[in-house]
From Swiss-Prot:
This is ATP-sensitive inward rectifier potassium channel 14. The gene is Kcnj14. GO terms for cellular component: dendrite; monoatomic ion channel complex; neuronal cell body; plasma membrane. It comes from Rattus norvegicus (Rat). GO terms for biological process: potassium ion import across plasma membrane; regulation of monoatomic ion transmembrane transport. Keywords: Ion channel, Ion transport, Membrane, Potassium, Potassium transport, S-nitrosylation, Transmembrane, Transmembrane helix, Transport, Voltage-gated channel. It catalyses: K(+)(in) = K(+)(out). Residues 1-81, 186-434 are cytoplasmic.
Length: 434
């Protein structure tokens, strides 16, 4: 797509009559607002995800020179990264090859000494080893320390003794490698990501009088994620003023790195907030522009597993169609007696906030600057009251559901439980002027 645009631009530049059109096309491609790709490129077809919703990267490597040699140079990491079935097959073949190699060695030593001849010598190198199968069984018993007591090595042949010593050393090294690789693979925090979840959608709404992009993260386990922190990047195609086409330009999305709010205490689900300011790549996007935009928001959660102290990383992504403008997340944290309760039924649910501005954050800032000398606040008080009452109603509905479940489960209630538990309602995030 970018190559075709570059060829069209180049052909237009070579034709004298189309020089002005080529300049206009180049200016439109390179100097479009906020660096977005032109409308025909972004509007014809949505590009595939770079990072899937489950965190897997949608990338395939091709034409790698010397790929096998590079993987074998770091054999331990290769064994840890491969699937279990290939790992088990590799280790089984390694043990089998070791037994066959030393069995063949013992058979050759016995054959050269004459132990396999029709009249066996009075002092053989190996007792009860008269064939290749017997030599293979002797190698197996030696490396695994089975010790049936039938076959053994004698002091007649120093070469046989040296071969037995060499097999013991090689067997110890192979066992250590196999045990280390299996333990490292079992201790990988990859499966820990299954209990770290992101919300299905992200939302764009006002918070503290600023337009913010928000999404939720949650931990389904009781064990904590130590030193948990979040990051986000915006991936989008871009054409530089020089005409270079970048298929995926990575832009950092600030989630509070300077203030330290990117480091989270993930005991209950937390809403990650990105304030859309002048440094944000979404600063010039309103609701209409967002629907036509072509980008991918990649969100990352990192931390150390409490049980193993190994670092884990959980990833997900959001497309423009998954950013809900003018929505907020439903409350998930409620107080039940002396404990707090997290209801994951509401984790992915959102509700619409009427009156949310549909313009971009840039236009909001311009309007706020124009109305800065006005004594009245431009933010309606009825909207703030609705937001608070809406979240309060959600908490009350949660209380009613709990009360109905309690009444159905028990015929009589104690006086302590007669009073309905008080829900932990979110505090009003918007302070209205008097």
């Amino acid at each position: 797509m970018g190559l075709a645009r570059a060829l069209r631009r180049l052909s237009g530049a070579l034709e004298p009559g189309n020089s002005r059109a080529g300049d206009e096309e180049e200016a439109g491609a390179g100097l479009c607002r906020n660096g977005w790709a032109p409308g025909p490129v972004a509007g014809n077809r949505r590009r595939g995800r770079f990072v899937k919703k489950d965190g897997h990267c949608n990338v395939r490597f091709v034409n790698l020179g010397g790929q096998g040699a590079r993987y074998l140079s770091d054999l331990f990491t290769t064994c840890v990264d491969v699937r279990w079935r290939w790992m088990c097959l590799l280790f089984s073949c390694s043990f089998l090859a070791s037994w066959l190699l030393f069995g063949l060695t013992f058979w050759l030593i016995a054959s050269l000494h004459g132990d396999l001849a029709a009249p066996p010598p009075p002092a053989p190198c190996f007792s009860q080893v008269a064939s290749f199968l017997a030599a293979f069984l002797f190698a197996l018993e030696t490396q695994t320390s089975i010790g049936y007591g039938v076959r053994s090595v004698t002091e007649e042949c120093p070469a046989a003794v040296a071969a037995v010593v060499l097999q013991c050393i090689a067997g110890c090294v192979l066992d250590a490698f196999v045990v280390g690789a299996v333990m490292a693979k079992m201790a990988k925090p990859k499966k820990r990501n299954e209990t770290l979840v992101f919300s299905e959608n992200a939302v764009v709404a006002l918070r503290d009088r600023r337009l913010c992009l928000m999404w939720r993260v949650g931990n389904l386990r009781r064990s904590h994620l130590v030193e948990a922190h979040v990051r986000a990047q915006l991936l989008q195609p871009r054409v530089t003023p020089e005409g270079e086409y970048i298929p995926l330009d990575h832009q950092d999305v600030d989630v509070g790195f300077d203030g330290g709010t990117d480091r989270i205490f993930l005991v209950s689900p937390i809403t990650i907030v990105h304030e859309i300011d002048s440094a944000s790549p979404l600063y010039e996007l309103g609701r209409a522009e967002l629907a036509r935009a072509d980008f991918e928001l990649v969100v990352i959660l990192e931390g150390m597993v409490e049980a193993t102290a190994m670092t884990t990383q959980c990833r997900s992504s959001y497309l423009p169609g998954e950013l809900l403008w003018g929505h907020r997340f439903e409350p998930v944290l409620f107080q039940r007696g002396s404990q707090y309760e997290v209801d994951y039924r509401h984790f992915h649910r959102t509700y619409e906030v009427p009156g949310t501005p549909v313009c971009s954050a840039k236009e909001l800032d311009e309007r706020a600057e124009q109305a800065s000398h006005s004594p009245k606040s431009s933010f309606p008080g009825s909207l703030a009251a609705f937001c608070y009452e809406n979240e309060l109603a959600l908490s009350c509905c949660q209380e009613e559901d709990e009360e109905e479940d309690t009444k159905e489960g028990t015929s009589a209630e104690t006086p302590d439980r007669a009073a309905s538990p008080q829900a932990l309602t979110p505090t009003l995030a918007l302070t209205l002027p008097p």
